[in-house]
């Protein structure tokens, strides 16, 4: 049985119960404040601090509730919406030792639930991948017609924003660059500029679009690259990068680094 599901169901109930409690407490607090203001001209005294146990319990529940709320929200995007009142009923019955399902039934249902989530997730991912492929092809076709955009045989597109005067790196070189990577809609997924520190790496150990593109740049250049998914992360994507996504990179080639000497490597 998926341990995550155990946590999901319990925490979802906690989140719902906390929400209900917060509403009741807020209403009661507002009523008390009105009465206090009406009867006392001076500032109302501060409420006593909650006990360590109460604060700890609330903090744990609130943290869990927020995490699960985000999880359930993503599941709703797949078409699954759990009834909060039923979740609370299950928790109440469990605490009261009045379970209406056996352990075997619980395990079977949660396994089915897990399988359903996986099925819907895969279906959505497959659908998104097809849509991204189509959108990417349309984007690149239109982009290729823009002034200043050049294309290579591999399908890589680039635009020169500043042409440097230094040497061009080879695939086996180590380069130092500043870059910002975005999706075609402008969503930023990575940036050495934001981190305030250039990136240094062997040029033949990055995605193909980078290996090819940066070799076109003399040191001191600034290029904008448009990478077809086949030259980036392909049908699998990576992290926040969707499958079959076209990527856009603003790259500044700062330097070609010398490889560390054997003696230096031995010291590390």
Curated annotation (Swiss-Prot):
* EC nos: 5.2.1.8
Look at the named UniProt entry and state the broad enzyme category this protein falls under: isomerase
| PPIase FKBP-type domain span | 172-257
A Pfam family hit = FKBP_N
Q: Check the record and name the InterPro entries matching this protein.
A: PPIase_dom_sf, PPIase_FKBP_dom, PPIase_FKBP_N, PPIase_FKBP_N_sf
Reaction(s) catalysed by this chain, per the record, are: [protein]-peptidylproline (omega=180) = [protein]-peptidylproline (omega=0)
**Which is an annotated GO molecular function term of this record?**
peptidyl-prolyl cis-trans isomerase activity
Q: Which GO terms describe its biological process?
A: protein folding
Q: What is its main location?
A: periplasm
Q: Any one cellular component term from GO for this entry?
A: periplasmic space
Q: Where in the cell is it found?
A: Periplasm
Q: Which residues form a coiled coil?
A: none
Please list which residues make up the signal peptide.
1-20
Summary of the function given for this chain in its UniProt record: PPIases accelerate the folding of proteins. It catalyzes the cis-trans isomerization of proline imidic peptide bonds in oligopeptides. FkpA probably acts in the folding of extracytoplasmic proteins.
Record protein name field: FKBP-type peptidyl-prolyl cis-trans isomerase FkpA
Species whose genome carries this gene = Aeromonas hydrophila
Gene behind this protein: fkpA
């Amino acid at each position: 049985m998926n341990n995550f599901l155990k946590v999901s169901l319990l925490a979802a109930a906690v989140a719902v119960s906390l929400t209900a409690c917060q509403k009741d407490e807020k209403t009661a607090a507002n009523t008390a404040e009105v009465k206090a203001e009406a009867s006392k001209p001076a500032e109302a005294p501060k409420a006593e601090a909650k006990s360590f146990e109460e604060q700890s319990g609330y903090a744990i529940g609130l943290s869990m509730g927020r995490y699960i709320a985000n999880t359930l929200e993503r599941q709703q995007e797949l078409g699954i919406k759990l009834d909060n009142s039923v979740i609370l009923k299950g928790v109440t019955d469990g605490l009261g030792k009045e379970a209406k399902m056996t352990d075997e039934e619980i395990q079977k249902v949660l396994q089915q639930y897990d399988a359903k989530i996986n099925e819907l997730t895969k279906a959505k991912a497959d659908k998104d991948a097809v849509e991204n492929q189509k959108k990417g092809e349309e984007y690149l076709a239109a982009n290729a017609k823009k002034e200043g955009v050049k294309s290579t045989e591999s399908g890589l597109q680039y635009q020169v924003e500043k042409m440097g005067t230094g040497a061009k790196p080879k695939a086996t070189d180590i380069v130092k660059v500043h870059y910002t990577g975005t999706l075609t809609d402008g969503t930023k997924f990575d940036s050495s500029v934001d981190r305030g520190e250039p990136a240094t790496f062997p040029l033949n150990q990055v995605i193909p679009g980078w290996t090819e593109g940066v070799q076109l740049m003399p040191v001191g250049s600034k290029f904008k690259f448009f990478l077809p998914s086949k030259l980036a992360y392909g049908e699998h994507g990576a992290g926040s990068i969707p499958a079959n996504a076209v990527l856009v990179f603003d790259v500044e080639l700062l330097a070609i680094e010398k490889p560390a000497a054997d003696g230096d490597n031995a010291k590390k």
